[in-house]
Amino acid sequence: MKKMPFILKFAYIRVNALRFGRIFLETAFKIGRPIIGHPSKTASKSYHFFLTEATYAPWKVDSEFQEVYKMLPTRSVALGEVQLYDLWNSVKSVKKIDGDIMEVGVWRGTSLALLGYASQKYSPNKKIHGFDTFSGVALASENDPLYVGGEHADTSEKIVRDVLAGANVTNAELHIGIYPMDTSEKTPQKISLAHIDVDTYDSTILSLERLWGNASIGARIVCTDYGSCTATGVPPAVEKFVNDHDNAILGYSIGGSGIVQKISL
């Protein structure tokens, strides 16, 4: 009988270890969830810790993505590597869609720098628009049990501009204030891609409602907080918006982002 190659044996060991770890962690989560609890009983049923055997990780071997990812300052990285790869691929996917790129919720500028870098590479004629209060989370309500407002205020316009300069991004504009109440008029006339990272129900749905009319057919709106266990107001906001608009479809990315796409006028 032919012996199994060592590398294949090693792979089987890793897969079995992953399966054991998954069972252990999922069991621990099921036991611990009722004990720890969650501010929202409804939300607690919608979140689950899991491991997967689908371990293909194209972002690890995408040299162009890794080049810009490694130049981003670690202190400013709010999103994980996989979520940033979602944005990277989104810029590439809308390169033939008419319209600029915008981000609501810039924080310290990491994702805005990635969007700017990618757009300069794949869609050099598009402008990048960043919207932020620079004073923390806005419009927290009873729909956001883990937020009171003002979180993530450890940023400034200067910090963001320095991050943009470090990534050699020259096509970005910053707009300061609560979007859309304070800066609605700065919304691009045509939008091919929007990234919404605002943590709360009201900020999410108001941003979607305002920019949707300017979104081109085929445009993507990436809602990073959709899968976050802390921003529990975001999924119902995104889902309500999609349910209310026949020309919107919703997808869920490997990075946990909710991706809304416009399929018709």
Ranges and model annotations:
Residues 1-74:
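Membrane-proximal basic amphipathic "stem/tether" segments
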Residues 54, 58-78, 88, 95-265:
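S-adenosylmethionine/decaboxylated-SAM
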Residues 82-86:
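N-terminal pre-P-loop "Q-motif" helix
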